[in-house]
Amino acid sequence: MLFLVALLLASCTNYARHQLDQRYGLANPARFDHPLSIPSAVSYRRDVKPITDSRCAVCHGCFDAPCQLQMGSYEGITRGASKEKVYDDLRLSMMAPTRLFTDAQSNAGWRLKGFSPVLNERHADTVANQEAGVMARLLKLKSQQLFPKAGLLSAERFDFSLYRAESCPTIEEFDGYAKQHPEWGMPYGLPALSNNDQQTLVHWLEAGAPVEPPQPVAPAQFDRAGQWETFLNGRSLKAQLMARYIYEHWFLAHLYFDDLPERTFFELVRSKTPPGQAIQLITSRRPFANPQVPRVFYRLRPVQGTLLAKTHMPYALNTARMARIKSWFIDEPYAVTELPAYTPEVAENPFVAFAQIPMRSRYRLMLEEAQFTIMGFIKGPVCRGQVAINVINDYFWIGFVHPDHPIQESQNFLATALQQVNLPIGEQGLSSLLKWRSYARQETDYLRAKSTILNQALTGNNAPNLSMLWDGDGNNPNAALTVFRNFDNASVVQGLVGEQPQTAMIMGYPLLERIHYLLVAGFDVFGTVTHQLQARLYMDFLRMEGEFNVLAFLPVQARDTVRDHWYRNAPDDVLAHLHDSQSLLFKNSGIVYKTDQPWTELAGLWKQHLKPVLNQRYDLTGTALQQDLGLLRQLDSLKGKAVSYLPELAFITISDDQKQAHHFTLLRNSAHSNVSELFKEELRRLPDEDTLTLVPGLLGAYPNAFYRLNSRQLPEFIRDIKQLASEADYTKLSARFAIRRTNPQFWAHADALHASYRGTFPIEAGLLDFNRFENR
């Protein structure tokens, strides 16, 4: 039966294709590879791109864009759409990578990879450009339907769930799509474009979607990029090994020169050609894969496409940073006798591949921009999806072992020991799950060796105390970070936000490096479900190790109590691992505690110790709404089951008496009995322990809701939240304070948020993503 249905659908598609060919000619995928910049009243860069960015790329931006249609660049639009999902929890074989600007160099190449056009690739005339293009047809379909102006959208007609079935019609399938889903024009599930924006896009499409030549890189930017390329392509073995290490840690970075007035972002890529020649990209699934060339050159390529909040990771380059890197990697007295191989047993283990580089040098590179380092895990492709990200708690702090503390000598030994500990990186098949016990044994053996070393080192003045924590050298706010998980995504910010997190982690070089290679450099978003589960399971060990480091700062007699609270009702194998690991460290803390709540006390001492370098950006005391500070703190302090009805991440706009808008982020921190199980997270939820965190400004890339109120409504808003006892109660609160998907002011409000974001933090700002926006 299924075969007959498939055969019928294929026949219908072939017939539709024949009809289109008869009317508008044969499709030519190369048509937009070198588009003509024909005279047109509409400019792509001046008129069209601002619309496709603010109305289209906010849902169609990256790997998780519906149908892989990325609309943040001209090349993304001309590439088109695919029916294959990047994030597929059931994938048993590796998927061919589909990275824009990387895995195909022409639209014909993308057609061979299964992408279908959304622009007209047939004969170019006004009628064909409208009738034979999916994008034009979707815009027209939206304009033909009346969209609700209030209330909720029908759950029967609109599915906003993360793993919903996608409809990715080709032009041959579009008539059937429009007949079956007349309300599914674009933007999907959001208000239609304004008449002016609609006409701008229609006129551009009618003209054949012309585009101007790309703007050349400014001479000052070009020269500065050349200086860094020269630095990263030295001939000595030392310089080559340094460059390889830097690349494997910066490959996701958006590099910029912070002392130049113009802002251009670059990405570090591997090339077959040296500086001064056109880049010939070396493409590979992972940054440490064999480049298949005698010499790799590291080049700076301008970032193409719109910056997205969920992937934008700015990293400043300047002469001071170059000098520091040179002092760590070149001036340091060590010898590089040969370059490491790219074989899996070497390349997949950074403690083997870079053993010749002093550990302190490696640690310093990661530590100096620790937020960026952790952001690779948080913003990298691993963190899309609940199963991938539920390995961490909803709200925790991160600190780092001081690179110059005597305890680092033991870290050197541990880094050497990790040459024998494998990460589950390269294996993709189901059989690799059978090796899980082997990984567990290796980790247990490593922790025993670590405990032996620490028990010897943590004596006298070296007993665990706050001097062991890196203080940012007195001026670096990367010394302390806070992570917020929002169900299936997360955010990391500088500072110790809030008064007491759910848990915390302290990392030294070995742990930081392993997390990077497990979840950033070694993670394959196009890999199998087995590979992704292995990474998630192994991260359990690494998270526990970071928490184990925190427990060492507590009195011996308090450690079990705190640990058991973090791991309530955890599986027996997890508890056995925890008890074994924790019992191995018997040295007491060097901190003198004055209360019977040492975990709470430690959080306060930690904040006090790092106060000179803590980033206070997310402290409510800095808000301009000083007259309402008490109410804001009251909202921030709410906890319990009532707050569990709120979305994970909401942006609140509060207008003062002068009608000045002030933006805040409200985060719901979901409590769990433990985070050491893969599935059925809802069974481990503890809604009575949920808390809220309110911070000034915008934090996070995936808002679930927008709230708008004036400052005089704050008491009522807080009262209504306190009284939430059902989904129906939340619907009433939303009806009063939320800007829902159906609100005609939705786009104007989104524009105001983006304008505020760019105006306040122009370097880090990127487009927000509305794929998780609620319909409640």
State where each predicted segment sits.
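Sec-dependent signal peptide recognition
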Residues: 1-5
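C-terminal motif of bacterial Sec signal peptides marking the signal peptidase cleavage site
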Residues: 8-11
